[in-house]
Amino acid sequence: MKLLERERADLERYLPGLDGLLAETSSAELERPGSPGVKMFRDAGGPALVIPIEYKGLGADPVAAVRIQRAIGSRSPSLAVATTMHHFSVSSLVLLAAGGGNEWLLLEAIASQRMLVASGFAEGRPDGRILAPTMTATVTDEGLRVSGVKRPCSLARSMDLLTASVIVPGTDGQGDQLGVALIPSTDLGVSVTPFWASFALGGAESDQVTVDNVLVPNDLVVPTGPADGAHLDEIQTAGFVWFELLMMGSYLGAATALVERAIAVDRVADSEKLTLVTGVEAAMAAVENIAHQIPDGQRDERLLADALLVRYAVQDAIAAVVPRAVELLGGVNFMTSDDVGYLAAAVNGLSFHPPARAKMAGPLMEYLTGSSLRIA
């Protein structure tokens, strides 16, 4: 068995030909703005990956999904990060459809038409209030008039739909609640402008999306949970679990790409190689443990707490493994190929995704002493 063999086999099983295309395309091409990676993913049927077969999807379970993200991350970190945002958005729609909603119609359209869904939820907010709405919404007889800005927004230039968090009137008539507005990218009120300036993850299309007074019909607005900005309902909890799971797999893939290069170097001692492999494989085992629990426990805050603890442990594993892999690869590899330096930079992205460790230290310790989990 080779490192990443299992993950690449799952990628080939669900999205035939994609791994080969990514492998034969240079990292420089895949990681630049305007990367062909997103189109490759779409053409391979990737938008349907986590959509159940009953909704015309491919029906990948959480374990297969996270392995596939790791495989993609080892070829193109940008593509792995970008597609995680699609899968995260779709997974929430799957849960809503399972509750008897009409979301199944949208899921069938996403799967059959290979539509990409971008997430307009509050990543990258300096105040850290990641559950607070990213958009303002005004109630009208026809639906909601939505306006706002999301930056960065992965898949900004390839998306077919944007999911945006908004405040909507409560279904029980008692106050407001959070909701998700589904906004077609073709609406004249939706525009995309440059935002991402870093060389790292440039292929993820993480630019600015502006929504200007877009009318969203009521049937494309889905109430989700409380509007207090801290506590989650079951749908939000499950969405966060999926988000953390797939992001961990994506960045572990990028880290493993460096390990894969290092263990191929003859002069590196077996003991050093084993240390690198142990680091990434132990981290992946912890991630897969979360994935195995998702079918029965994804709505449970306990699993989300476990996912966050594993996520911060994965960050530490990456921080330990990657510098050592770069050192063992040596100066010649670093100087003669951009790939080593690029991967070493890209893996740091995991620590920037919400919720940050420093923000969650207090809430997690409160949770571990008996309080409900809140998201900071």
Predicted feature locations:
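Generic structural signal for well-ordered, non-transmembrane alpha-helical segments
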Residues: 16, 253, 274-284, 308, ...
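C-terminal helix-coil-helix/basic helical segment that borders enzyme active sites and/or dimer interfaces
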Residues: 19-29, 263-267, 282-316, 323-334
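Glycine-rich flavin
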Residues: 33-43, 48-154
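Buried hydrophobic positions in well-ordered alpha/beta secondary-structure cores of metabolic enzymes
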Residues: 68, 146-148, 211, 255, ...
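Glycine-rich, charged/polar anion/phosphate-binding loops
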Residues: 149, 168, 193-198, 241
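DPxDG-like acidic metal-binding loop motif
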Residues: 149-187
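Glycine-rich beta->alpha junctions and the first turn(s) of the following alpha-helix
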Residues: 196-281
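Glycine-rich phosphate/cofactor-binding loops in nucleotide/flavin-utilizing enzymes
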Residues: 331-376
